[in-house]
Amino acid sequence: MTKPNGSSLDDHLDAEVARDASLADTAATIRALAAAAIDVSETVGRGALAGDLAAQGEHNSDGDVQKALDVIAHKRFMQALEEAPVAQVASEEAEDVVSLKPGAPLAVAIDPLDGSSNIGVGMVVGTIFGIRPVTLGTDVNASFLTPGTTQTAAGFVVYGPATTFVVTLGNGTRIFTLDRAEKVFRLTHDALQIVPSANEYAINASNVRHWDGPVKSFIEDCLRGTEGPRDRDFNMRWTAALVADAQRVLIRGGVFLYPGDNRKGYAQGRLRLLYETAPIAFLIEQAGGAATDGQARIMERVATKIHERSPLVFGSTEEVECVAKYYDGRQPSAGRSPLFGQRGLMRS
């Protein structure tokens, strides 16, 4: 990571367009998203003073109950994108693709409010987006039914103690932090490089009884620490907000797992390919990390429907590769014993 210079997000976007003029529309769209993010940040920052942001309403496209802040964020980002060179939007909060400007060159996939379960309790929430070129034709879904490698940019926003805007336009991943006084995002982490290996993993361990064998074995061996085949101790982290875990991995490494499991409807996990896993994968790869569905590269997956789900494993390259070894039978085997099963956590 090179030393940040405090330059603004606008400065960075200008430099990217100077480097590649074809990114002008993408840069304009990112500016619109950043402006909306500042507004959403102000609402989140007011907490209960802004009303009951956790109030439940209707169900969204995936069957989740929408909360008030979900709706607020969706409306604000849609308003922003109406002013951008965007033809179509696929949002978690809309069942179908929303058409905006006919003939515009870009399509945006967005999760307006990631981490909805954290609303109302003072924990981190965020926004995730991916930008793609429009696919010409009459099918408004076609622009999104392409591999993640077609993305021209991706990013996420973390609304926490600080508001950060994490973005890539295919030339490295950077973090900009909101200067609340000036309402400007300023560069604080330049040209991020994820360390190849680290001693942290993130997974929702409450689902252990539903995991398949490879995931159970990987986590078991992490938990055994220096007494197991990984030969070192690990810490577990889980924030219930993908953006927060992703930002932590970008800064200090580790591995994040949201696997598929044997619950009904969870064979492909819970995260959505277009507006969660593909954008995160782009950002992680641009920072020197890896992102897979456990075995195959996320960026090469092609959605067959707008709200398609995908398992997700991302982070330090050696850790992601290690997970893949468990799936294909190459995992470490030294010292595996029934002791851990007797403790109960990983018993099938």
Swiss-Prot record:
A GO term, aspect molecular function: fructose 1,6-bisphosphate 1-phosphatase activity
Annotated residues for binding of Mg(2+) 2: 111, 114, 276
Pfam hit, one: FBPase_C
Family of this protein: Belongs to the FBPase class 1 family.
Protein name: Fructose-1,6-bisphosphatase class 1
Cysteine-cysteine disulfides: none
Cofactor binding note of this UniProt entry: Binds 2 magnesium ions per subunit.
Catalytic activity, reaction form: beta-D-fructose 1,6-bisphosphate + H2O = beta-D-fructose 6-phosphate + phosphate
Main enzyme class: hydrolase
Cellular component, GO annotation: cytosol
Pathway info: Carbohydrate biosynthesis; gluconeogenesis
EC numbers, comma separated: 3.1.3.11
Signal sequence residues: none
Cofactor field: Mg(2+)
Positions of Mg(2+) 1 binding: 92, 111, 113
Compartment annotation: Cytoplasm
Superkingdom of origin organism: Bacteria
CDD domains (UniProt xref): FBPase (cd00354)
GO BP annotation list: fructose 1,6-bisphosphate metabolic process; fructose 6-phosphate metabolic process; fructose metabolic process; gluconeogenesis; sucrose biosynthetic process
Alphabetized HAMAP family for the sequence: FBPase_class1
Quaternary organization: Homotetramer.
Binding site for substrate: 114-117, 204
Keywords: Carbohydrate metabolism, Cytoplasm, Hydrolase, Magnesium, Metal-binding
